[in-house]
Amino acid sequence: MKGVAVFQGKLKGGYCTFIQDSPKSPVKVNGHVQNLSPGKHGFHIHTYGDIRKTDCTKCGGHWNPRNNDHGSLTDENSHAGDLGNIVVRDDGTADFNLKTSKITLYGKESI
């Protein structure tokens, strides 16, 4: 199963792909963003995909189907949508690749 998010507006040209080979396999997440300030930026999935407002007021909270606490990618009981940080280079771009079993592309908890 594969899903793609395309970022428009402030993140013009950004994308993120999600690939999961089977319901029990981890999700491979990779992508590219641009026009961000250099340094670390939190990377997470929100409940809704509406990013028309730059302050994320239309996005809802972090994806959290099990009502866990906020945390990092490595915290066992954090929001499913908490995917850690990405590091943006001085030119405002970042590429990222990770694997996680905290999210799924299958079933009722699918992103």
Q: Residue locations for each model-derived region?
A:
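N-terminal leader/targeting pre-sequences
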Residues: 1-111
